Amino acid sequence: MHPFRFGVVVNTAASGADWIARARRAEAIGYATFLVTDHLGRQLSPLTALMAAATATTTLRVGSYVFANDYRHPLVLAREAATIDFLSGGRLELGLGAGWMTVDYRRLGMPYDPPAKRIDRLAEALPLISRLLSGETVDHEGPAYRLGGAEVHPRPVQRPRPPIMVGGGGPRMLRLAARYADIVAIQPQFSPKGRARLREATDGAMARKVAILREAAGESFERLELNVIVADAGLAGSGRPVGTSLLAAGKSVATHLVGTPFALYGTVGQLSDALERRRDRFGISYYALPSRALDEMAPLVEALAGR
């Protein structure tokens, strides 16, 4: 059983100083990771932002949540990841996914291939990135990628390599994660326009996803750290309306998520009990909280982190 960890997903800031202050605040509260997503809208560029957060802190881990595989060649991404891990003293978590938001592909002028093709490319890229970060010299000729004598320098500090997170919600993505990941971000599936499919964000759906992971990983299941993204979170008595961000994602059915792993509302005691039960049932121990809840959820982080 993994101890509880909490990350905070932060994509924007009012200024450079504000970005640094947020990273330092997260570290002071006890968040384990400072996470940045990978979209082409109004957010900071993840690689540069993660390095800035790492430079401003001493123990806070930084991570991509998650890099879209199609946007970068595996060697280019492995080099960037190795450099961040080296310069941060070994604090990178490398999150990867197949890419899913149509507007990002349109902005890049890239074809938005069917999921099977995007997952094919990720399945080819994952072992290449893992081998490169582990210090191997890689020669490869495949359907999507070719590498000849490829290496990354300097080597990452973490050995054999920085932990890899794979994010996804469909059966094939979960099986891929079971094979290559150290951390699995179990996500509700999204429509190409970015709306969560809420039928995939229930406790019943979570049980099915974990069962797929368990079957695919076999004896290695216990080594996997299971993560979920929290769409909205709040402590009882905070005065903030419940489900405002969920309503943006799912309209009138948003309240159905209250009480699932994807929405955390209640007192510290209630939430502590709920997270303990979910860890016992599903194995979920790592929660990625939204930036707006960074300070509000501090009492929960302080109560559970490391337990």
What are these regions (language model features)?
Residues 1-307:
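Active-site-adjacent structural elements that line small-molecule/cofactor binding pockets in enzymes
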